[in-house]
Swiss-Prot record:
GO terms for molecular function: rRNA binding; structural constituent of ribosome. This is Small ribosomal subunit protein uS19. Signal peptide: none annotated. Belongs to the universal ribosomal protein uS19 family. Protein S19 forms a complex with S13 that binds strongly to the 16S ribosomal RNA. PROSITE patterns: RIBOSOMAL_S19. GO terms for biological process: ribosomal small subunit assembly; translation. Pfam families: Ribosomal_S19 (PF00203). One of its GO terms (cellular component) is cytoplasm.
Length: 91
């Protein structure tokens, strides 16, 4: 079930403060965050945010199409190495 419109989008306060500061100072430095649950707001467009995926920080460049999605959607947590293969078929 999606979040109620009257509540508005969720974003962690510490991340919002960093975004406001970066927009105000026109900073190009990536913003490092562990907050995968925060929603992408229109103010973030053009910024680079490094989102933690459990092991490293993945740089995500925010574009117009990402607004309304969560930051965690753009930093995959699992590495897919393909399905198992048959050793006999390889020979």
């Amino acid at each position: 079930m999606p979040r109620s419109l009257k509540k508005g989008p969720f974003i962690d306060a510490h991340l919002f403060a960093k975004v406001e500061k970066a927009v105000e100072s026109n900073s190009r430095k990536p913003i490092k965050t562990w907050s995968r649950r925060s929603m992408i707001l229109p103010q973030m467009v053009g910024l680079t945010i490094s989102v933690h995926n459990g092991r490293t920080h993945v740089p995500v460049i925010i574009s117009e199409q990402m607004v309304g999605h969560k930051l965690g959607e753009f930093a995959p947590t699992r590495t897919y190495r393909g399905h198992g293969f048959d050793k006999k078929a390889k020979k």
